[in-house]
C-alpha cells in the first residue's frame, strides 16, 4: 500500500512540475524463463530444479519529461512456473512436480531513451500473489497458502524501438526481475528445516525424516522478452489559471 501511495504521489508531483511533458500509454506481452531460487534445493543432488517458463501481459502509463527521460507505471498480470525433477531410487521412478504461481505486478520504472532508439529501465516492483497451484502427474492442489501475499523486488530492462509513426510505435525488450523478499509463508515451511518443495515428506523415500541443515529463503527470479505497443496520449500544458491540464492529441 505504501508503494502504491508513493507511486501515485510521485506521478502527481511530476504532472505539476513539467509543463512540456507528455503522457503515453501502452499494451505489452512477454514470455520467458521463471524460477524460484533456493540454495538448499539447488544444492540437493536428489532434486533438480528445471528451467521453467512463464508469461505476462498488461498495460502501462508513462510520463515523458522530454524525448530521453520517462517514468512508467506498469500493471502486469504474470504467470510463473517452477518445475522440480526428483531423482529415481531402486523402488520408484523419477517424478516431476510443478508449482504455478500467478501475480499482479506493479513496477515503477525510470526509463532512459537514447537518440538511436534503444532504452534502459530500472526501478522497484511490488507483486501481489493471486494464486498458486502444485501439480504432480494429473493431480493439482491449491497451494496459495504456502506463499506470502506480497513481494517487493527490482526490475531491470533494456530494448529498442522497432517501428512506428509520430504517436504510435512498437518496441521490443528484455526485462529481468528479482524478488528481494522470501516468497514462502509459515504454511510453506518458512523458518523451518523442512519447507517447500519437500514440506510434505517428498524426500522421505530417500531418507526417512529428511530435513535441510538450515533454512534458506526462496526468491523469485525471471527474464522475459516483451513486445510493447505505445501510443502518445496527451501533452501537459499550463492553462490560463496556472494549472497543469492534459491536452489530448
Where does each model-flagged region fall?
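Short glycine/proline- and aromatic-enriched beta-strand/turn motifs that initiate or cap beta-hairpins
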Residues: 19-62, 219, 226, 230-249
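Structural signature of outer-membrane beta-barrel domains
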Residues: 32-36, 78-82, 127-131, 177-183, ...
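Outer-envelope beta-barrel architecture signal
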Residues: 21-25, 67-73, 116-120, 152, ...
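Residues on the lipid-exposed face of transmembrane beta-strands in outer-membrane beta-barrel proteins
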Residues: 27-31, 55-65, 77, 104-112, ...
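Predominantly the C-terminal beta-signal and adjacent terminal strand-loop region
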Residues: 146-151, 156, 162-249
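Extracellular loop and loop/strand-boundary signature of outer-membrane beta-barrel proteins
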Residues: 42-48, 91-97, 139-146, 212-215
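Outer-membrane beta-barrel translocator domains and adjoining extracellular loop/strand segments
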Residues: 37-44, 83-90, 132-140, 183-191, ...
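Glycine- and aromatic-enriched membrane insertion/assembly motifs of diderm outer-membrane
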Residues: 46-91, 102-103, 117
Amino acid at each position: 500500500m505504501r508503494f502504491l501511495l508513493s507511486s501515485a504521489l510521485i506521478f502527481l508531483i511530476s504532472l505539476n512540475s513539467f509543463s512540456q511533458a507528455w503522457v503515453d500509454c501502452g499494451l505489452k506481452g512477454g514470455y520467458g524463463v521463471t524460477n524460484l531460487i533456493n540454495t538448499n534445493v539447488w544444492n540437493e543432488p536428489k532434486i533438480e530444479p528445471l528451467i521453467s517458463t512463464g508469461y505476462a501481459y498488461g498495460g502501462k502509463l508513462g510520463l515523458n519529461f522530454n524525448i530521453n527521460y520517462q517514468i512508467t507505471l506498469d500493471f502486469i498480470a504474470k504467470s510463473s512456473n517452477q518445475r522440480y525433477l526428483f531423482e529415481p531410487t531402486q523402488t520408484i521412478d523419477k517424478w516431476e512436480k510443478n508449482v504455478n504461481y500467478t501475480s499482479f505486478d506493479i513496477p515503477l520504472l525510470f526509463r532512459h531513451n537514447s537518440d538511436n532508439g534503444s532504452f534502459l529501465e530500472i526501478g522497484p516492483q511490488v507483486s501481489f500473489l493471486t494464486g498458486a497451484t502444485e501439480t504432480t502427474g494429473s493431480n493439482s492442489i491449491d497451494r496459495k497458502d504456502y506463499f506470502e501475499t506480497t513481494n517487493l523486488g527490482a526490475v531491470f530492462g533494456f530494448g529498442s524501438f522497432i517501428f512506428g509513426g509520430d504517436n504510435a510505435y512498437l518496441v521490443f525488450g528484455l526485462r529481468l526481475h528479482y524478488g528481494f523478499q522470501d516468497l514462502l509463508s509459515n504454511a510453506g515451511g518458512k523458518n523451518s528445516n523442512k519447507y517447500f518443495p519437500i514440506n510434505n515428506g517428498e524426500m522421505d523415500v530417500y531418507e526417512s525424516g529428511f530435513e535441510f541443515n538450515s533454512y534458506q529463503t526462496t526468491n523469485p527470479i525471471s527474464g522475459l522478452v516483451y513486445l510493447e505497443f505505445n501510443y502518445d496520449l496527451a501533452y501537459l500544458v499550463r492553462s490560463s489559471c496556472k494549472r497543469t491540464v492534459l491536452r489530448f492529441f
